[in-house]
A protein has these predicted regions:
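PLP-dependent aminotransferase class I/II
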Residues: 46-52, 60-61, 124, 135-148, ...
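Phosphate-binding glycine-rich loop
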Residues: 40-87, 101-103, 111-113, 135-144, ...
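Conserved coil-to-alpha-helix start sites within the AMP-binding
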Residues: 94-99
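Structured binding elements
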Residues: 106
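Active-site phosphate-binding strand-loop segment of PLP-dependent enzymes
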Residues: 117-215, 220-222, 227
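N-terminal "arm"/small-domain region of PLP-dependent enzymes with the aminotransferase-like
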Residues: 1-41, 374
Length: 399
């Protein structure tokens, strides 16, 4: 019987986790400083420093820390002027957070399929939908099927690789749309030399425990728009209008990151380059070692991209390999190697209405074939070689 392995389970001598944090820098020192000085809540020098260093890393003028990446997405949608009953184009092949954030503001997601080579939102499918399924009157763009206004595009950079953003930005310019980059899996990745989060009108990062750097839980909104940054700070601090009196003239949110967690983030940010190097080294060993196995397709890096390979996720072609991804997943977990499928595409989720969306056949295929392999920054060569050996042995046995 296959042992059930909990997400985020700690590593042990005979267990290889999917992704765990790497806390080996100044985390203890900075957190202790917060405790020693009693600066543990939502203001403090580490919050300021974490925002500053994230903005520098993203290549934007401003950054606003939030409690998580979903909160950053929620605020970004509000800044972009997305209203109830509007529609937002969003990647279908993604974790559910961006679709949920769209619903938080009363708007509706329109799911766009992935392109088959890099598994990111397909700009061609987005353009096809806007040109064929929408009506543009020179000032507003509306979905012909629902009658709703299209307000924004929310491309999600999945697995550490960028979406092809130039065509997305061109569509946004043509139809007066806002672009919200979901870079929650893309910190440190680059598109044509530009850091993710800096290409669209606003970008969002996540510092969840499985991300390339972590605060345990946290997020960040980045932008070059001073007015938006000021508004984000206002909304994330319960929309408080007076520094002394408790006066509120708008609905706000308790979304600010604590100084304690920001201290962790500062320490982690100091190690980001090292972490990216480790992720890319892990990806290279997987790619080279699995290259000759039938039906195993490695993730590809576009010539215009710099990927962090945050989560190494090959595709398993059942016809060529003789097995499907779920059988391989069970075999790995039976050998105490934590592997996971990718997310159910959002157009298949019963939580969201996809009736106004185009078809998404590529995402359906990717969902069936994808399997995420152990990708922790601290994954050693011996452990990774064991993962590779289990995969190779299982494919050989089944063929």
């Amino acid at each position: 019987m296959t042992e059930k392995l909990a997400p985020g389970a700690p590593p042990s001598a005979d267990f290889i986790p999917l992704i765990v944090p790497e806390l080996r820098g100044n985390e203890w020192k900075y957190v202790k400083d917060c405790l020693d000085t009693n600066w543990v809540s939502s203001v403090g020098s580490y919050v300021d420093r974490f925002e500053r260093t994230t903005a520098e890393r993203a290549g934007t003028k401003f950054a606003v820390a939030t409690v998580n990446g979903t909160a950053a997405l929620h605020i970004a949608l509000l800044l972009a002027g997305v209203q109830p009953e509007d529609e937002v184009l969003v990647s279908t092949l993604t974790f559910i957070a961006p679709a949920n954030a769209i619903r938080y503001v009363g708007a509706w997601p329109v799911f766009i399929d992935a392109e088959p080579k890099h598994l990111q939102m397909d700009p061609a499918r987005a353009a096809e939908f806007l040109e064929q399924d929408c009506r543009w009157d020179g000032t507003e763009l509306r979905n012909r099927h629902t009658g709703r206004r299209i307000k924004a595009i929310l491309p999600v950079h999945i697995l550490g690789h960028p979406v092809d953003l130039d065509p997305i930005m061109e569509l946004a310019s043509r139809y007066s749309l806002q672009v919200i980059e979901d870079a929650t899996e893309g910190l440190g990745a680059r598109y044509k030399g530009r850091n993710l989060g800096s290409v669209g009108h606003v970008g969002c990062f996540s510092f969840n425990g499985n991300k390339i750097i972590t605060t345990g839980g946290g997020g960040m909104l980045v932008t070059d728009n001073a007015e938006w940054a000021s508004r984000a700070r206002y909304l994330t601090t319960q929309a408080k209008d007076d520094p002394i009196e408790y006066v509120h003239n708008a609905v706000g949110y308790n979304y600010r990151l604590t100084n304690l967690l920001a201290a962790m983030g500062c320490a982690q940010m100091e190690q980001l380059n090292e972490f990216i190097e480790a992720k890319r080294r892990i990806a290279t060993l997987y790619r080279e070692s699995l290259a000759d196995l039938p039906g195993v397709r490695a993730p590809e890096e576009a010539e215009w991209a710099f990927s962090t390979f945050w989560m190494y996720t090959p595709l398993i072609d059942e016809k060529q390999s003789g097995i499907d991804s779920r059988r391989l997943l069970r075999e790995l977990n039976a050998n105490k190697i934590q592997a996971r499928p990718l997310w159910q595409p959002m157009h298949r989720s019963r939580a969201h209405d996809a009736s106004g969306s185009p078809s998404c056949p590529i995402a359906d295929v990717v969902h069936r074939q994808a399997i995420s392999l152990p990708s922790s920054v601290g994954l050693g060569p011996a452990s990774q070689s064991h993962v590779i050996e289990v995969i190779a042995s299982f494919l050989k046995k089944e063929n």
